[in-house]
Structures are given as C-alpha cells and as structure tokens.
C-alpha cells in the first residue's frame, strides 16, 4: 500500500506495512518527531488521508509510565508540544494533546486507533516505544515511518557494526538526499479533531501540570535548555553562525564549548535532522564536514544498530570478543568500587569524572568527548560488564535530556567494545577493549575550569533558597535544589 506514496515517502515506511481499512480518519501519532515541518511521518499521514478521502489529525500524548519519567523530561517534552500545537494550527492541521495524570488516565490512543483507517507513527527502535507500537498494531493498521535518519532506516537489511562499513553503505543514499529541499505536504481538508477533550498548552501552566503528574519530582528541569522547535532552531542557528567553522578544532575541548548542544532537540524531533544536514552541506568548511560525519555516520549507525539489535540494553548485545575479554579481566583486583549513590551524586572523588556527572545532574547534558571518559571509567569501577552497562544506562537515561536515544545506546555500548575493534596489547580491567583512563584525559584540558562551569546554576542566575522543614521530604527538596545549582 505504500505504493500510494511518492518515492521519497514510500522509502521511509517500514516494509510490509499492513493495508489501511475502512475507518473514520487517519491518525498521526507523534512521539519523537514533534515538529510541524520537514516531518516525513506527518506527510505520510496527510498523503494517505487524501488517498483514502478521510480527515487526518495529529495525536500527541505524554505518559507517566515510561521509565525515568521526571520533571526534567516532562517539562522539555511539554515545551516542545506547545510549539508543535501552535505550528500545526498555523498550518491548518488539527491536533489533540493528552497529558496522563490523575484526572485522566484513559487509553485514548487505543480508543482512537479502533476507529481509524490507519495509524501512522514516527519510529524509534528503542523501548518502551517498540512495546507501545505492538499494542497499537494489535487494534489498527500501523505504519511506522523513519523521520529521523537521512538514509532511510529500512535501507539496510543486514546489520553493520563498524563505522567505516556503515559509511560506505550509506554514502550513496546520503549523497542523493543531502541537499534536496523538503517540500511539506499540505492538508487536503479543513482542520479536523475527533470528540476529544484536548489540553490547550498555549494557556497551560506547565509547572503546575508537571507537578500534578505521578513522576520523579527529584530530577529538576534544566531552565537554560527550553524544549521546542523555537529553542532548537535558535540553538542550531547560533552554532551554525558562530561555532560550526571551528568545530573540527574545538570539539574535543569541553572548556571551549565547541559543540552544538542540539542532541536533545534531535532526540525529540523538535529540530529537523534534514535541515541540519542540509545546512552543513552548504557550509563547506572542515568543521561542517566533521560535524556532518558525526551527524550521519555515528548517529545513524546507532539507529541502525538499535533497529537490528532489539536487546541493545543487555550485555549480550556486545560482540563476543568484548564480552570474553571483559569477563577474563573481572579477576583483576578493583582498587575502587563506588556505590551507585556515589556515582549518581558525582561524589567519587575523581575531579574529572565528578564534573562529568555534575554536568548530567544539573544541566542534563554531557560533552561527547568527556562522555567517553565518563563511560569507560565504569569498567574498572564496577564488578563486571553487566553492572557497568546497567549503571551507565541508568545514569544517562535518568538525567540526560537526550537519554534513551539510539545515540545514547550507541555511545555507551561503544565504551564497552561495541561498534569498535579489539585493541592490543591488552590492559588491566579493559582487556582488549579500547582503554581510556580519566587521569590521562584530565591532562588534555583545564579540568578546574570545566568543574567551575559544571557547577554554574542551571537557572543562569544564582538563587538563595532556604528549605524549611525536616524529614525525608525536606531532605529530598534540598537535594533537588542543590542538583539544579
């Protein structure tokens, strides 16, 4: 049935998609492509609604029940949802928004899906999204659309696990798509919404909404990183104009702040990766070339890896050589085994590592170069690879705004040997896995300055706050405020 679509959209629909049926409407269920333009999933939904001669609308929801749900993630997602609601309205596309909370926990999506001719969604090959996909597919035809990678996710039928082989396979696809403008599909009918009590986010008090959700209120919002298309475009435009040309030179020094810091906007789809790639291709500098390689090769390799390895959160996904060498070196005596709490609070006593964790704790992000040091430190600091992987995923997904992304899994698994090759000679703790020692990395930049920057308040302006009251609640409130700076 994807033959009803133009080629540039058909290639983005998962193969063997089920045929639409008789139904009242087409639903675009958006999750990680929360933008109103340059959105292949939205365009597929609009095109199919025209073909089926039924209305189309966008369904967007925020659950309390995903792992690591917190004030930080909820706030960022709601800020993005507010922009999306506004932008869809401006384009004449109907939309509804549901925030799961005590007042309303009904399964609205399943109720709407049962009435739909077709449900279209943007695919991300990680949990819990894959589980949710299966639940919807059980009651309605579901088309999963790649709205996140320049080279369509379905173009690679077999797994590729090294950057050079993935780059070689993907380059022809990138080259024919890189500079092509994206032409949005226009709605064929007036805005439509079903009988649904939608939340109007333009008038909503977002902090009050978040406070009413049954989520982790101990992970505070990052006030200097607002979610949404406007904020994402602003951050990208600033980097494009001021930082892209020097990216190749400055990107490895976290003190110089030579990176784009757009990963959270790409993760939630507030910013179009096609726009970013197109801008880079037109820049024609060494920095743009290097940035494009990171955006396409490494980011899309991680998506490809997660698609072909649904067990990407388990140690068994590591290559056999990596599992074996790490297991053999479990016998190496560990001089330091910090507790989870020491790690989470950034209280290991190692200045560089603690500053990295402070970056996650207070700012919801971690510079990519020190992220590798942060991740590999847990090989000698934990009992085995299984524990290291579990703790790294937890620390990253709990605090990072771009957590739970295929890129997060790719980067963390790389620390343990995935997407890499064996190294010789073997070293203590790491065996044949590429080693990276915090003490050695600390010699390469000004760690004291990095520490100072990571301890800046997340609000931008320091606040003096007194927490009055004792007990567990008072202690938790004080710690949350301290984490946020």
Where are these regions (language model features)?
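Long, compositionally biased intrinsically disordered regions
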Residues: 184, 444-457
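Short, flexible loop/turn elements at secondary-structure junctions
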Residues: 30-34, 99, 123-125, 146-149, ...
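Trp/Phe/Arg-rich N-terminal binding region typifying the photolyase-homology
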Residues: 1-181, 185-186, 287, 358, ...
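N-terminal Rossmann-like FAD-binding beta1-loop-alpha1 element of flavoenzymes
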Residues: 462-485
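A short, basic/flexible loop-to-alpha-helix module at the beginning of a structural domain
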Residues: 15-19, 455-463
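Glycine/tryptophan-enriched, flexible segments
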Residues: 21-22, 152-154, 159-317, 449-450
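Alpha-helix C-terminal capping/helix-to-coil transition sites in glycosyltransferase folds
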Residues: 111-115, 235, 462
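Active-site-proximal binding-pocket segments
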Residues: 253-446
